Each structure stands twice: as structure tokens, then as C-alpha cells.
């Protein structure tokens, strides 16, 4: 189904209420820098490579005024490991004004109640909520956005979300998400949030509201139990990202 078909199918009233055709979104007028780090962690399926790359491009196009770091794994190997993620976050942080700029992290993979699966060739790891919370704290960057596209990704919210850290997840802590086919370009959530809603919405919140409705509609049509995407925290972060007049 194309993006236009998705929007027609969801229905005009909700789209008219939430989604507007907008000029590019940028940081506020004081030239706030937004640095994007995007990791496709599970190498056995190409959808995570595609989604990590595509999501970073969309976010940078809507918000970007800083560097982009995209890493992913394949069946043969790759550098998107837990250690590499910690290093990439620190490198990104070193180029930011820690009080004023924004660190934007995107993670896409399979997930479980324990965390996110990392698979690079024969290497297997689990990125836990406590692992990620520690990494983010060590960056010293105040304002952060974390978007996690994975099953059970809501498990990350309790340890991550706070007024300075906005967290968006593809599912709650008790449900899988869908669309992890090897040759797909996007997961269901990635398609709805990054590929459709965020390209047009005026804010992350608006994009999330539309994406959540799109995902639920698709899941019900395909007889899946809804994954219940979540958004939490970020009261001090989201206002810093606005549409430039």
C-alpha cells in the first residue's frame, strides 16, 4: 500500500485534524544543532538496515542541522554493536553544545522484554534498558530524543523517559510490533511514523498520533493484536523543535 493509499484509508477527518503539509522542520531560531545517530542492530534481516538509513534521512531532512551517523549489521557482520553505539553517542555528544543542542537516537531491531537484539554475523548481544540509559547519561547532553522500532520496546520507557528525554516506541512493554520481513524497506511502525507521518507533521507529537492510528488500522486489518506504540517524556525537548516560518 502506498503512502497516499495509507492516508486515504485512515480517513480524512483525523488527517485534517493532525497532519498538515508543512515546510521543513528545523530547530528554533537560535540555530540549535540536531545530531542524528541511527543503528540497525539485527543483521539477519535487511529491513533494519533500510529502516535505520531511511529514518535518519527523514529526521535529518525535517530537523537536521548537524551530523548524521548511520550504522547497521548484516548476515556477515557489521559494526552496529553495543560498544559501537556507546562510542557513536559520545562522538556525537562531543560535537554538541550539551545544554542547548539535541541528540536524536534511532534504534531498529527485534526486541524482547529483556531489550533489543544485536546480531552481527556470529556476534549476538542484548541492549538492555539499563545499558542504554547509562550510555545516554554519559553523553552529558541535556536534550535527547530516542525512537525505538522493535517488539516490546516499551520496556525502555521507565528508565529513559523524563522531561529532557523524549521516548517513542513501536510497541508497549507487552506486545510485539510487526513488519520485519527481510526485503521490506520499513517495519509497520517505521513506515507509518518516519515514511508517512513525520514527512508532513509539524511536530513529533503530531507525527506520533497519526502513526499510531495508521499502525493500529493496519494491524487490525491483518488480524494482529495491536502493538500499542507509546510516547513518553520530553516536555522540555519537543518545544525546541518547531516549524520555521
Question: What residue spans do the PLM features occupy?
Answer:
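N-terminal secretory signal peptides that target proteins for export/translocation
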Residues: 1-6
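Bacterial N-terminal signal peptides
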Residues: 10-21
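Boundary/activation segment at the start of structured domains
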Residues: 23-100, 179, 184-187, 242-245
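Loop/turn elements at helix/coil->beta-strand transitions in domains of secreted/extracellular proteins
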Residues: 31-35, 64-68, 98-103, 140-145, ...
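Extracytoplasmic/secreted cell-surface and envelope-processing proteins
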Residues: 45-49, 78-82, 113-119, 154-158, ...
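Active-site microenvironments of hydrolase-like enzyme catalytic domains
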Residues: 92-121, 144, 150-176
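A short, glycine/acidic-enriched catalytic loop
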Residues: 109-139
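Active-site-proximal C-terminal subdomain of hydrolase catalytic domains
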Residues: 150-238
Amino acid at each position: 500500500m502506498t503512502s497516499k493509499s495509507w492516508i486515504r484509508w485512515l480517513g480524512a477527518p483525523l488527517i485534517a485534524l493532525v497532519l498538515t503539509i508543512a515546510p521543513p522542520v528545523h530547530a528554533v531560531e537560535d540555530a540549535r544543532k540536531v545530531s542524528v545517530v541511527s543503528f540497525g542492530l539485527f543483521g539477519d534481516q535487511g529491513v533494519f538496515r533500510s529502516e535505520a538509513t531511511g529514518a535518519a534521512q527523514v529526521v535529518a531532512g525535517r530537523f537536521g542541522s548537524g551530523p548524521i551517523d548511520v550504522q547497521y549489521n548484516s548476515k556477515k557482520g557489521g559494526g552496529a554493536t553495543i560498544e559501537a553505539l556507546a562510542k557513536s553517542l559520545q562522538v556525537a555528544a562531543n560535537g554538541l553544545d550539551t545544554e542547548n543542542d539535541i541528540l536524536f537516537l534511532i534504534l531498529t531491531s527485534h526486541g524482547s522484554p529483556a531489550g533489543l537484539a544485536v546480531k552481527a554475523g556470529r556476534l549476538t548481544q542484548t541492549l538492555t534498558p539499563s545499558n542504554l540509559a547509562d550510555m545516554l547519561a554519559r553523553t552529558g547532553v541535556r536534550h535527547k530524543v530516542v525512537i525505538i522500532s522493535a517488539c516490546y520496546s516499551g520496556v525502555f520507557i521507565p528508565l529513559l523517559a523524563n522531561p529532557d528525554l523524549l521516548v517513542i516506541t513501536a510497541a508497549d512493554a507487552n506486545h510485539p510490533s510487526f513488519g520485519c520481513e527481510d526485503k521490506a524497506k520499513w517495519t509497520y511502525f517505521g513506515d507509518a511514523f518516519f515514511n508517512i507521518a513525520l514527512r508532513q507533521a509539524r511536530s513529533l507529537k503530531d507525527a506520533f498520533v497519526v502513526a499510531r492510528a495508521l499502525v493500529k488500522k493496519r494491524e487490525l486489518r491483518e488480524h494482529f493484536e495491536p502493538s500499542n506504540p507509546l510516547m513518553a517524556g520530553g516536555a522540555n525537548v519537543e518545544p525546541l523543535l518547531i516549524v520555521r516560518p
